[in-house]
């Protein structure tokens, strides 16, 4: 008499697969998740990762550990080369998009190496001048620059930084001849602006807000396309004579390419819910960012459109990263 239970017929085997498949998908996650952040420890990207990680730990029931990796290439490359199993994630900074456009030796492809999960938040820059500089509006700044071609200079946190690219776009759209003075980081560039050693600069919100409040700098405009809740008293550059001008840093969460859609969707659902919590929104807002919380598809489209936009600007200007 044949033994029962030792041989699975094709029909029974199919049923087993149907039952086991969803159960395996529902098991994620079964171990701690590494959340790699780009940039300096304590910087904006690292701060965002540390806001999200404890909430994601509670939501998923597994510890989410923030792994800050110094530099711009190493963190992204680490995630790109990790197993696509949902246990290694990336909190990206703006350099994820910009750096491959300015260097030829970047080991990852922004579109092909990652699976977008959600666009978490966006940060604009603020156009600021020294209080003694005569321009009190964007149009006045442009008029002065046009009247003195090649004489005005602007600072940035470094070649290829978001503050540099914001100014480069401004230069192109305003059709002005101005001189770029790159510094090593925001602190040095802001010190130069406060010392009236450069005439204007596009600054990150967190760094410029207290300086404007104390009267050490004067803000002229914000670089969002529409009025920003972060700076309700400031006009946009777009509404101040340069229609269509926009510069916002795109920051989100990504996984290695090939990560199963079920895992991407789980992470998207949980992270978007986290981003809608008032305390999280307030924390981002106070740090100079506005929460987004997009679908994976929306984030993917944003990445591609940003690459196309800035790729042309960087190529035409011949910008090479430091």
Predicted regions and their residues:
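Hinge/capping helix and adjacent helix->loop/strand transition within the periplasmic-binding protein
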Residues: 81-87, 101-188, 237-239, 248-283
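N-terminal (or domain-start) structured segment
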Residues: 25-112, 151, 159, 175-202, ...
């Amino acid at each position: 008499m044949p033994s029962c239970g030792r041989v699975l017929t094709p029909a029974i085997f199919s049923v087993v697969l149907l039952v086991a498949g969803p159960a395996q998908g529902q098991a994620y996650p079964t171990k701690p998740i590494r959340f790699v952040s780009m940039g300096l420890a304590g910087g904006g990207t690292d701060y965002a990762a540390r806001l999200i990680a404890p909430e994601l730990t509670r939501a998923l029931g597994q510890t989410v550990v923030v792994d800050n990796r110094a530099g711009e290439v190493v963190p992204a490359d680490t995630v790109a080369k990790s197993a696509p199993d949902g246990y290694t994630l990336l909190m990206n900074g703006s350099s994820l998009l910009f750096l491959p456009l300015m260097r030829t030796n970047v080991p990852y492809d922004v579109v092909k190496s990652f699976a977008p999960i959600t666009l978490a938040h966006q940060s604009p820059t603020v156009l600021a001048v020294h209080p003694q500089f005569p321009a009190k509006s964007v149009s006045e700044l442009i008029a002065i620059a046009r009247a003195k071609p090649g004489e005005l200079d602007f600072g940035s946190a470094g070649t290829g930084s978001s503050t540099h690219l914001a100014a480069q776009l401004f230069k192109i759209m305003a059709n002005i001849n101005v001189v770029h003075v790159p510094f090593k980081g925001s602190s040095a560039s802001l010190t130069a602006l406060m010392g009236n050693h450069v005439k204007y600069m596009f600054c990150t919100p967190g760094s410029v807000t207290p300086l404007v409040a104390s009267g050490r700098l004067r803000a002229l405009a914000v670089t969002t396309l529409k009025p920003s809740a972060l700076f309700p008293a400031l006009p946009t550059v777009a509404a101040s004579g340069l229609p269509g001008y926009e510069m916002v840093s795109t920051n989100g969460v990504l996984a290695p390419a090939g990560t199963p859609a079920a895992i991407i969707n789980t992470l998207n659902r949980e992270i978007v819910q986290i981003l809608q919590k008032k305390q999280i929104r307030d924390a981002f807002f106070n740090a100079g960012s506005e929460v987004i919380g997009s679908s994976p598809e929306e984030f993917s489209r944003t990445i591609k459109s940003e690459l196309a936009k800035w790729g042309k600007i960087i190529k035409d200007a011949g910008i090479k990263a430091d």
